[in-house]
A protein has these predicted regions:
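Glycine-rich, acidic loop regions that bind phosphate or pyrophosphate groups
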Residues: 1-84
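Active-site diphosphate/adenylate-binding microenvironment
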Residues: 85-170
Length: 171
């Protein structure tokens, strides 16, 4: 919803793949796009960029930081109405899933239980596919860095080395 109604998208290293956009022609139809990517071939390949910027994301964002800080210091936006709208939509359309009639476990239920058992201190890693979407929806992530996934990159085999790295970082 926030993408669909946005008037500006700042896309950093985004491929605008169909897992992010759905039907590209209908994605964020009113938004101007600032597309930052180190690979010039990616900019504008799927979604037109009004402001194409070729460069390393770290360098580009460091260059932008003073302007962002200046704008934020002038007037902090009031998001109260936006949060009220989002919360009303969450209430009207809660996440859920149908329990199977055949006595089998639903994968959404299993993932939800894994999240409950792991709790807020756990770090979760997901591979690519439907389980990645369910894990994003049915596990409650309460701290930064606790959800490791390859996003729209579609990298099969990501989850095992990501989980190993997480264990090394937080034994």
């Amino acid at each position: 919803l926030s993408f669909q109604e946005a008037d500006l998208l700042v896309a950093i290293g985004s491929r605008f793949d169909d897992r992010v956009t759905g039907k590209v022609a209908d994605f964020a139809p009113h938004a101007k796009v600032v597309h930052i990517d180190i690979d010039p071939a990616e900019i504008g390949k799927i979604r037109h960029a009004e402001v194409p910027i070729v460069g390393d994301a770290k360098d580009v964002l460091q260059d932008f930081l003073p302007a962002f800080e200046e704008a934020a210091a002038k007037q902090a936006p009031d998001y109260t109405a936006w949060w009220e709208r989002l919360n009303s939509l969450r209430e009207a359309y809660p996440l859920g899933f149908d329990e199977p009639d055949d006595g089998l476990l639903s994968p959404q239920w299993v993932i939800q239980k894994i999240g409950e058992m792991g709790g807020p201190e756990a770090v979760y890693a997901a591979g690519v596919g439907q389980h990645q979407m369910w894990a994003a929806q049915f596990i409650k992530y309460e701290r930064p860095g606790s959800w490791l996934n390859s996003g729209g990159a579609g990298t099969m085999g990501y989850s095992v080395p990501a989980a190993m790295g997480a264990k090394v970082a937080e034994p």
